[in-house]
Amino acid sequence: GLYHNTAGVPGFEGTTDGVEVRLHPNMPIQESTALWTFDGTFPPKLLQARYSESVLMRHYNALPIDVSANHGFGLHTLTTHEHNGHNPAESDGYANAFFFPGQFYDYRWPMVLAGHDSVNTDALDARAGTPDGEGGVRKIPGDYRETMSTHWFHDHMLDFTAQNVYKGSAAMMNYYSALDRGNEGIDDGVNLRLPSGTALDWGNRDYDVNLVLADKAWDKEGQLWFNPFNLRGFVGDVMTVNWLYKPYLDVRARKYRFRLLNGSVSRYFKVALMNQSGEPVPFYMVANDGNVMEH
């Protein structure tokens, strides 16, 4: 499903085909040529996957055939890279392996642990496993220390990655495993029981929130703007979260998990949590660029 809708605008929950996309309720409707996205939704949909269950993503390129229909930036040829995934070369989204509007490309992401052909090949380690859908774990080969957690996939077009990602061709992907199954209620000695929920066997997101942080810029008409001639690194002057300007999220008085993605072109972040009094709130870092950290 979509990331948490904090704007209260129903249009954010449907397709962008004829839907009025606003980055803030008081901002103008964005032109369709200014924003490109996955699967016709905005923000792009979240992909949830578990280990040992391969993902086949058929990516249709439905962008305009007219190369100038881009609001001044971005290229309509695409190649999709699943960042930090252990994927075969033909499905890695190499920068020159692009396809044109009207075409599609099939990406096969096998969802395997690193070292699956050399480490724990007999699949005896319970820490190397995947949810079985019935509250248990199915053991799999590979190195549990390389368990992935939070990924993203994005356009990887040669010379145009920054522009296409800036326009919206980027989405998050959650990996689920025996260590990180997305069910905080299962206590089997392996599951880390990170904040999530309990209704589903795996992949609960009641208290597990994906957040894409990105700086943007608008032109004088309030439309998304980018400077393609800035080769030193474009930096926007407005911060967004999940493509919303000044969003909010209603929460309960309990622990939450936030999966943060730096979706900016050049900017880096120092992230902190503050209470209403401006005092810092402590938090735990559980993963970094995909991998669950040593614990």
Predicted feature locations:
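N-terminal, post-signal-peptide metal-ligating segments of extracellular/periplasmic oxidoreductases
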Residues: 1-99, 223-258
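Short, glycine/acidic-rich beta->alpha junctions
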Residues: 39-41, 132-136, 143-150, 157, ...
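Residues that flank catalytic or metal-binding motifs in active/ligand-binding sites
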Residues: 43, 53, 76-78, 101-105, ...
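Outer-membrane beta-barrel proteins
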Residues: 45-47, 143, 161, 199, ...
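Extracellular/periplasmic metallocenter environments
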Residues: 62-183, 295
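Histidine- and aromatic-rich segments of cupredoxin/plastocyanin-like copper-binding domains
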Residues: 84-116, 213-295
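Low-complexity, Pro/Ser/Thr- and charge-rich linker/hinge segments at domain boundaries
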Residues: 178-205
